[in-house]
Swiss-Prot record:
MF GO annotations: ADP binding; ATP binding; proton-transporting ATP synthase activity, rotational mechanism
Gene symbol of the encoding locus: atpA2
Coiled-coil zones: none
Compartments reported by the entry: Cell inner membrane
Site residues, Required for activity: 373
Record-listed E.C. numbers: 7.1.2.2
Domain of life: Bacteria
Protein name as annotated: ATP synthase subunit alpha 2
Protein source organism: Vibrio campbellii (strain ATCC BAA-1116)
Amino acid sequence: MQLNSNEISELIRERIVNFNLESEARNEGTIVSVSDGIITIHGLADVMQGEMLELPNNRFALALNLERHSVGAVVMGPYADLSEGMKVKGTGRILEVPVGNGLLGRVVNTLGQPIDGKGAVSFDRMDPVEVIAPGVIDRKSVDQPIQTGYKAVDSMVPIGRGQRELIIGDRQTGKTAMAIDAIINQKELGVKCIYVAIGQKASTIANVVRKLEEHGALENTIVVVASASEAAALQYLAPYAGCTMGEYFRDRGEDALIVYDDLSKQAVAYRQISLLLKRPPGREAFPGDVFYLHSRLLERAARVNEEYVERFTNGEVKGKTGSLTALPIIETQAGDVSAFVPTNVISITDGQIFLQTQLFNSGLRPAVDPGISVSRVGGAAQTKVIKKLSGGIRTALAQYRELAAFAQFSSDLDEATRRQLDHGEKVTELMKQKQYAPMTVAEQALAIFAAEKGYLTDVALNQISRFEEELMAFGRTNAQPLLDKINQSGDYNDEIESELHSLLKEFTALQS
């Protein structure tokens, strides 16, 4: 088929008329190298630190190195099919995650996408993962307790709402168990919880989720997962994503608790990314800003004042303070708390609960070492009844440890020393507690009262656990109004003291 000159000119005229003159400005670059999840991009202009870069097949990378002629970015997800020459687009957005009440009861990944097979997540809004922590003027002092349900913690190292309390110890010393029990204990107290699992085995995380579900605490909890098999970038970002989800509740005048399990693995993931980006290594091969990595995260846990909440909610919530309490976990190697990351996090947080392998293996669980465990601000927040009753607990345990070491070299001890050793031994036994069995304030007060007022003197050491169980059952059956009164008010006065004495006298009379 041949076209004549008229037809050709008509086709050209039609093309000219229909030519699309619209232009689109796109910030686009080209991948010049891919290795170990790190891509180097040439040609991208106006990229922000931490910006989301769009890759083929609906994937994203995070811009971390902004150099004169190229951008170094870390891929969030699989990268095996990426190759040189592929196009990368700038989005102009910092990473955001979904937040809101709809996330409670769900298991999500670092990006807030559901991984529990329960369908799409309902959320209120998208918030950036990196935000500046509230300033000094916006904060309120910590003076309300957060109950972990552990006698050893609530009596000796109390935690307040808005505090950062580090849980530190070797592997297999009960760090995760303590954090999970603290979450389970919040289900009746109206505190929303976020559990961030970083670099853990998927089977371990599945077990934690199952336990939370069994104890009715999952519906009050958001579980954020960046398992060991996921990209280092997702493990590095997971704590920030979880913190943003927790800040949603804090900024609306509610109380939230977040557990980072654990920040050692986040630091290792960040070290991996930094070394691949060719940043200069420092002590233990960590980059120079590893302190800032954790400080900017943990400073976001705070108790904010009424004015901050009112300003944030545009006047919708008035006269309420909000709080985000953080329980970061750090794993030590052979009990070395002087390593780089542990010392960093100890200096950032408001105290630490040190779990010791030796105590754990000797059967003392939770294996809290009262010698170096401390709460720097929690004392002001401690429930009055526990504060007044537990004053002698730490002293008794410290003196017992000292005397026990001394008694090994001496057989003839005077009566006062024997009594002190006996009391310390029984208090140590009383501090033991089963997993997934958090205690109310009243139950803790009753147990500590029995120890402090000498009701354990005639109880054999191997009978302490049975004595405590039977005492709790007796109290729930015969003195529930008293326990309710202590739980509601948290006060301790002469009337409550005499009622506790009456209860224990009645109970010990039945035992004899």
